[in-house]
């Protein structure tokens, strides 16, 4: 998995998002990251959102944690969170990073995540569009 500092443009998916796709939680064992506590309520909500996450792109396989010897099946989804004219994108491994490595994501991410009830609703898709997420919906077309 590629490393991106939090809230920097993420070009992992290989399309032009004009700087509106910002990375959160794309960690690497060679880079420092913020640590702290996440509430159980926020962790459960993020877990639920990732469980049912809208996936506009096909995964090329699972990514493993390079911070530890984690060997579980994980890392093949991403969560897209619309916020203030941008889309914040976090890998599924963010749950592992929070739980096992005490990763603390930016406040902007948790605030935006709390506003999302589900990624399976039309309201969510409208929020993506309202925050420059057209590239996500175009990527989902066959």
Question: Which role does the model predict for each range below?
Answer:
Residues 1-142:
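Alpha-helical interaction/linker modules in multidomain eukaryotic proteins
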């Amino acid at each position: 998995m590629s490393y991106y500092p939090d809230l920097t443009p993420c070009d992992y998916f290989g399309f032009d998002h004009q700087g509106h796709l910002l990375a959160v939680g794309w960690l690497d064992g060679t880079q420092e990251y913020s640590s702290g506590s996440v509430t159980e309520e926020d962790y459960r909500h993020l877990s639920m959102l990732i469980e049912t996450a809208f996936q506009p792109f096909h995964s090329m396989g699972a990514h493993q944690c390079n911070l530890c010897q984690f060997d579980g099946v994980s890392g093949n989804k991403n969560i897209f969170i619309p916020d203030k004219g941008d889309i914040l994108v976090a890998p599924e491994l963010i749950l592992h990073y929070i739980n096992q490595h005490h990763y603390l994501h930016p406040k902007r991410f948790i605030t935006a995540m709390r506003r999302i009830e589900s990624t399976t609703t039309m309201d969510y898709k409208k929020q993506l569009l309202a925050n420059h997420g057209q590239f996500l919906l175009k990527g989902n077309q066959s």
